[in-house]
């Protein structure tokens, strides 16, 4: 595997996916401090929004400390070389949110759908291209679709105007061979000028290995987060990815030492709990469950007395996907009733 001289764009997730473990309560000062550190370290693209994207502030997903406008308005003017991106999920974010992001100076918009629902992205992708934004299609929970199925979905996004398409391992479920099969097929099917990206999670400790496998397959954009701050066991840890790429001769443009300092000095101190592979986040990866379900399942555990792991396994069995957060509590109630019924039978 010789990737010497290969150039990739490292895309930071700390200030968007990292909002999940922060319960979307990151302060403006924290946001600005980390963004400036990433910018100074040479990170070229930084995502800033609610964890569930533009318009994510809601009862279903959680209310943030500040609005998307406030976060973006605070960060964008401070950037010296980095561009800022925003995530948008059709059905949560609207075309008005997209226009607002453009007006504030957002460079890249990533339109995200479930890996079988690319058709709902047409309006937003088409508008983003009309606004001359760097326009990315983002296929989530990619392990739930076959390589052939993902090819069809990626080509739809490309036809709407996406100049880059992401294969997204939202559950941290995929192994390197899964990544190669999917990204290899999609890379072959897309136009040569359409970029390919990969977004990984570290629930099975595969974040780095999967990202390198993606680069092997022609991916030129790779997502990562400082100190791994993200949903579940976190995203691919940025400082480790940059170091591995440096060892392999893959060019990121990110300073190996400065990015470590961002993680240690700025990100780790604001963590509400350690981002690590505990039994619940491991279960996310093993059972193929959407990463941001983790804290919802932990809350349901406290409320109904059903272990989060048991809830997550059941969610995986049911094939629940992002957007069905309201079903987590329903699942916990069902499991609690089943436990109570079983206990009564044993007692009898």
UniProtKB/Swiss-Prot annotation:
The active site is at 20 (proton acceptor). Residues 8-260 form the Pyruvate carboxyltransferase domain. Mn(2+) binds at residues 17, 199, 201. SUPFAM superfamilies: Aldolase, post-HMGL domain-like. It comes from the Bacteria. GO terms for molecular function: 2-isopropylmalate synthase activity; 4-hydroxy-2-oxovalerate aldolase activity; manganese ion binding. Its EC number is 4.1.3.39. Pfam families: DmpG_comm, HMGL-like. Keywords: Aromatic hydrocarbons catabolism, Lyase, Manganese, Metal-binding. It is an enzyme of class 4 (lyase). CDD domains: DRE_TIM_HOA (cd07943). GO terms for biological process: catabolic process; L-leucine biosynthetic process. It catalyses: (S)-4-hydroxy-2-oxopentanoate = acetaldehyde + pyruvate. The record marks 16 as: Transition state stabilizer. Substrate binds at residues 16-17, 170, 199, 290. NCBIfam families: 4OH_2_O_val_ald (TIGR03217), PRK08195.1 (NF006049). PANTHER family: 2-ISOPROPYLMALATE SYNTHASE 1, CHLOROPLASTIC-RELATED, HOMOCITRATE SYNTHASE-RELATED. Belongs to the 4-hydroxy-2-oxovalerate aldolase family. This is 4-hydroxy-2-oxovalerate aldolase 1.
């Amino acid at each position: 595997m010789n990737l010497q001289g290969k150039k990739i764009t490292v895309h930071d997730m700390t200030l968007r996916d990292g909002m999940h473990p922060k319960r979307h309560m990151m302060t403006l000062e924290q946001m600005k401090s980390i963004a400036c550190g990433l910018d100074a370290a040479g990170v070229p693209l930084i995502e800033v929004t609610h964890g569930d994207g533009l318009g994510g502030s809601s009862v279903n997903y959680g209310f943030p400390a500040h609005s998307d406008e406030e976060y973006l308005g605070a960060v964008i003017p401070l950037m010296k070389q980095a561009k800022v991106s925003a995530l948008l999920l059709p059905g949560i974010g609207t075309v008005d949110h997209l226009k607002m992001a453009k007006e504030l100076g957002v460079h890249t918009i990533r339109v995200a759908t479930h890996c079988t629902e690319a058709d709902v992205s047409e309006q937003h992708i088409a508008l983003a291209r009309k606004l001359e934004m760097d326009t990315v299609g983002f296929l989530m929970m990619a392990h739930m679709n076959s390589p052939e199925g993902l090819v069809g979905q990626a080509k739809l996004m490309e036809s709407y105007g996406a100049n880059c398409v992401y294969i997204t391992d939202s559950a941290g479920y995929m192994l390197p061979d899964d990544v190669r099969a999917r990204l290899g097929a999609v890379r072959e099917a897309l136009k040569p000028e359409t970029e390919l990206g990969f977004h990984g999670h570290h629930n099975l400790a595969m974040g780095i290995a999967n990202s390198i496998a993606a680069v092997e397959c022609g991916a030129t954009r790779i997502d990562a987060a400082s100190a791994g701050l993200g949903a579940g066991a976190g995203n691919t840890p940025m400082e480790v990815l940059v170091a591995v790429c440096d060892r392999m001769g893959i060019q990121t443009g990110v300073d190996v030492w400065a990015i470590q300092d961002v993680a240690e000095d700025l990100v780790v101190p604001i963590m509400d709990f350690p981002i690590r592979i505990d039994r619940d986040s491991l279960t996310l990866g093993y059972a193929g469950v959407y990463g941001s379900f983790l804290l919802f399942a932990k809350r349901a555990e406290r409320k109904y007395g059903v272990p989060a792991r048991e809830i997550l396994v059941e969610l995986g069995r049911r094939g629940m996907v992002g957007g069905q957060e309201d079903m987590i509590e329903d699942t916990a109630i069902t499991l609690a009733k089943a436990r109570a019924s079983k206990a009564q039978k044993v007692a009898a």
